Amino acid sequence: MDLKIGKIETELNNILKKEGALYFVLIDPDEKNYAEVAEKVKDYADAIIIGGSIGITNLDEVTKNIKKITNLPVILFPGNVDGVTKEADAVLFMSLMNSKNTYWNMTAPTLGALTIKKYGLEAIPMAYLGIEPISKTAVGFVGEVNEIPQKKPEIASIYCLSASYFGMRWAYLEAGSGAEFPVSNEMILISKKLSGINLIVGGGIRSPDVAYEKVISGADVIVTGTLTEKNPDAVKEMKEAIKRAGKDKLKNKN
């Protein structure tokens, strides 16, 4: 079986190498304004990820409609085995590594694997890590997350290292949709330094300044979801801050 990096992941890596950071917009397929959000973000995001934590009923239709609106990569971010459609370009094939329930860290992805293969979807291997205050959000509740305390950033860094040893190429530090506060800069910094894995950071990022800080600290991808649902016009400023931080980060490396 060919486990080489696929087309979508290659494109993302090329942008990351050139621009220093990526901006993903998360769309919940059950939100009524999903088409409006897709229209607003199509000129600013690097990819659209589609997913939700609670029952999805119209994923095929939503994905088709979003792909009519934009040429951006449409990547699935499945909350369960029903979060997969052949209409997408790729799927974040993930393990919720710090769930208390083995269903979420192993059984669910295993049950979904054959469907992903039959659909011909590109699988992007990713560790999904629930960070404080995720227990107060839907994904924390549904996923039975043993959340990683913000004051213990070294725990997150070791999970990221473990993920890289398992062969995962991406790790998502998730504070949860609508979180009170985002993943700390320190946690991002030491997780990136120890593991070298591509870091996705989301949850509680409400301003361009905060997004800038996260990228400078080591985030490779910033995800916004609730923000763009409530204020789709905010994506332009978010993109500008993320890309500015990416350029500054690249300069600091040289």
From Swiss-Prot:
It holds the Pfam family PcrB. Its main location: cytoplasm. Signal peptide: none annotated. It is found in: Cytoplasm. Sn-glycerol 1-phosphate binds at residues 172-178, 203-204, 225-226. Mg(2+) binds at residues 28, 53. Its EC number is 2.5.1.41. It is an enzyme of class 2 (transferase). Pathway: Membrane lipid metabolism; glycerophospholipid metabolism. It catalyses: sn-glycerol 1-phosphate + (2E,6E,10E)-geranylgeranyl diphosphate = sn-3-O-(geranylgeranyl)glycerol 1-phosphate + diphosphate. InterPro entries: GGGP/HepGP_synthase_sf, GGGP_HepGP_synthase, GGGP_synth, IGPS_HisA/HisF. Keywords: Cytoplasm, Lipid biosynthesis, Lipid metabolism, Magnesium, Metal-binding, Phospholipid biosynthesis, Phospholipid metabolism, Transferase. Its cofactor is Mg(2+). It comes from the Archaea. GO terms for biological process: glycerophospholipid biosynthetic process. SUPFAM superfamilies: FMN-linked oxidoreductases. GO terms for molecular function: imidazoleglycerol-phosphate synthase activity; magnesium ion binding; phosphoglycerol geranylgeranyltransferase activity. GO terms for cellular component: cytoplasm. Belongs to the GGGP/HepGP synthase family. Group II subfamily. Prenyltransferase that catalyzes the transfer of the geranylgeranyl moiety of geranylgeranyl diphosphate (GGPP) to the C3 hydroxyl of sn-glycerol-1-phosphate (G1P). This reaction is the first ether-bond-formation step in the biosynthesis of archaeal membrane lipids. HAMAP family: GGGP_HepGP_synthase. This is Geranylgeranylglyceryl phosphate synthase.
